[in-house]
Amino acid sequence: MKWLLLLSLVALSECYIYKVPLVKKKSLRKNLMEQGLLQDYLKTHSINPASKYLKEAASMMATQPLENYMDMEYFGTIGIGTPPQEFTVIFDTGSSNLWVPSVYCSSPACSNHNRFNPQQSSTYQGTNQKLSVAYGTGSMTGILGYDTVQVGGITDTNQIFGLSETEPGSFLYYAPFDGILGLAYPSIASSGATPVFDNIWNQGLVSQDLFSVYLSSNDQGGSVVMFGGIDSSYFTGNLNWVPLSSETYWQITVDSITMNGQVIACSGSCQAIVDTGTSLLSGPTNAIASIQGYIGASQNANGEMVVSCSAINTLPNIVFTINGVQYPLPPSAYVLQSQQGCTSGFQGMDIPTSSGELWILGDVFIRQYFTVFDRGNNQVGLAPVA
């Protein structure tokens, strides 16, 4: 009996899932709108969501556009250093680097956020490597260092990360996050940096080489990133597994996109990235323009595609067929409701690749489907949320 108890305890310990709660906050776009700064920002900054996926090969000077995070609403807390210094970050499956503001940065954008102080960490190790994160007309520049990162109860030692030294421009002052924690593949990591999850797995800190994401539609909370396991209480039915078509981003093949049984986009298949770091559902501008027309969306002065809220009751599902399985998006998912009105969850952008133009399955899609990012088998698992 004692042996049975011991074996069950070992099994439980091997399957332990480390969870990071995600809090839903107002997006940077909404903060800028409330401050009356959005119009000025849009005039001086060219927002190109595609730029995130058009980076040149990783180099010593990393560049990662920040405009892509304008509409992000889900954020989690990590600790860096010994003792840990807390930071609010975006858990981003569309990038691979970790960076946060540092005390070396004195710009207003940095002063309004948590800043890492290497001198207050007994485990920090500096390097001579530089980092650059581009946005609009300027860029955040910084250095790379190593330290211990606390994430969801995991102690990730000797983790490389970026420390900002300059953050020009005023818009980052209102950002609801301090930094970014990338969860894509090492092949797209800037400066040859080892991504956080790779470092965690290499140290044997989780029992399964995967992590999973649940994004709640609830404004209060409930969203979570889980490292090292799958919690079936967050979804219904079985997970459907989709092999990756590229081990860079979490890239998969979509068979077709239909409405009322008719193909409206992605005829003959297309490539898509499952990206927690993109709020909307993005695709080629021509295809998205057609979809916006189907759902009656029109652009307002803030660059948003406005939809009549009453249309939610009459619009049809938009169905993504992936690896032979249909994933319907109801209008309540792709029409975003707020106190200011209703907007389309679709966004046009052009990302040409050798295999055609890319689609981005962002939070609009992930809110409907519990997602497993399986590094061990290079696949994505999808199931309807519970």
From Swiss-Prot:
For this UniProt record, give its keywords in alphabetical order, as a comma-separated list. Aspartyl protease, Digestion, Disulfide bond, Hydrolase, Protease, Secreted, Signal, Zymogen
The organism encoding this protein is Rhinolophus ferrumequinum (Greater horseshoe bat)
Q: Does the keyword Secreted apply?
A: yes
Family according to the record = Belongs to the peptidase A1 family.
Purpose of the protein: Shows particularly broad specificity; although bonds involving phenylalanine and leucine are preferred, many others are also cleaved to some extent.
Q: What is this protein called?
A: Pepsin A
Q: Which reaction does it catalyse?
A: Preferential cleavage: hydrophobic, preferably aromatic, residues in P1 and P1' positions. Cleaves 1-Phe-|-Val-2, 4-Gln-|-His-5, 13-Glu-|-Ala-14, 14-Ala-|-Leu-15, 15-Leu-|-Tyr-16, 16-Tyr-|-Leu-17, 23-Gly-|-Phe-24, 24-Phe-|-Phe-25 and 25-Phe-|-Tyr-26 bonds in the B chain of insulin
Which residue range or ranges hold the Peptidase A1 domain?
74-383
Question: Which gene codes for it?
Answer: PGA
What Gene Ontology molecular function terms does this protein carry?
aspartic-type endopeptidase activity
Q: What is its EC number?
A: 3.4.23.1
